[in-house]
């Protein structure tokens, strides 16, 4: 959980700060492809934010193609090679 340590500031939305931070971890390969992200409640408690904030972050990451969800199993980092290929044609 240490890699998810983030000092939130009051200048911008918490969910955007967390989204950008996790996205950067994924892009920088600090969270590997197919690695499971922390459960929503656990990450929310760790970051001292509401569960809904993390839900919003995970939904945005999924919409942007950085993660995928498996019902009953969790949220996982997507294959970034496929994301890069997809972006070529967008």
Give short role names for the model-derived ranges:
Residues 1-90:
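N-terminal basic, amphipathic alpha-helical segments
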